[in-house]
Amino acid sequence: MNKTYLILGGGGSFGIHTAKFLIDNASPKKVIGVGRNPLRSEPFSLGIQNEKGFEYFTRHITYEFDLLLELLDQEKPDIIINFAAQGEGAVSWRNSWRFFETNSMALSRLCEELMKRNWLERFIQIGTSEMYGSVNHPVKEDEPIKPSSPYAASKVAFDLYLVSVFKNLSFPMNVIRPSNAYCPGQLLHRVIPRTIWCGLTGNKLPLQGGGKAEKSYIHARDLARAIMLVSQEAPLGEIYNVGPKEPTSIREVVERTASALGVPFAEICEITEDRIGQDSRYWLDSSKIESQLGWSQLIEWDEGLKEMVQWGRSYTSQIKNYPTEYVMRG
């Protein structure tokens, strides 16, 4: 469609997979990635820097705000997709202000500036299923919001800001609230790549609470397809859940991953205490995006985990000494 897409948080694994998907499927004029850090090495960048029609810029949304605005005014993207966030609920109980600084304040400041420009067609915010809290049924977009961590609360704050500026100031926005995504190139503190890392290096995965918590998972390419559909077809102002039909316990995720590796489950993990604020179940009703935009989950567990294991085996030597704990960056 010859649009220019700009992806904030474009150096992360989901931003990279979205960029690749748009280049392959959306006929873009250009896809621009923007991140607070330079692109990581090949196991995590997936060669995105070599894609024709892709450019990457290092700009910090909080501390280099003026430089970011200069870039936006230079490129004048038709569509901005925002993945940029402090994104780990488990560590958000300390330095909680850092999560609000990025996830709420910096983004609302950016949108105020965008409202002064006339070139933006659509701003797509990537939210989180965590804002619904723990649920006992698949939740729809209009159900009560019950965040259980400072991280989730910071994401809720910006979602509600977007709703208000769309309603009162006609800011052209959409929100996608996806379930947990996974993909090759994902950093090793996430459960699936960390399980693969443990299986390949002989380390043990700390399985918090025995893995009884249930979450919903989709492959990053399924999320990218939802983003493309929203960018092309969604009415402005709409919010969409994006996830599978059923949740999966963390234990089952680890069991499936161990099986894909060919490593016994008992050899790959050890049971540890549950983390503070751990919700028991995330479960989304995605019928709205399915009926309105024709989205559906295409990549099932077997295909997705096979791809993840292939990625891990291909880069074992590069990732074996890579950090497996979340590091909060500025």
Predicted regions and their residues:
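Hydrophobic alpha-helix immediately C-terminal to the catalytic Tyr-X-X-X-Lys motif of short-chain
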Residues: 157-165, 195, 253, 257
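Tryptophan-centric aromatic hotspots in well-structured domains and transmembrane helices
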Residues: 26-29, 99, 165, 186-187, ...
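C-terminal substrate-binding subdomain of Rossmann-fold SDR/epimerase-dehydratase oxidoreductases
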Residues: 9, 33, 199-330
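N-terminal Rossmann-like NAD(P)+-binding domain of SDR-like oxidoreductases, especially those catalyzing
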Residues: 1-181, 315
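Residues in well-ordered alpha-helical elements
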Residues: 66, 78, 90, 97, ...
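CheY-like receiver
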Residues: 67-75, 113, 198, 226, ...
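Activation loop
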Residues: 88, 128-131, 135, 191, ...
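The catalytic Tyr-centered alpha-helix of NAD(P)H-dependent dehydrogenases
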Residues: 143, 147-154, 184, 188-192, ...
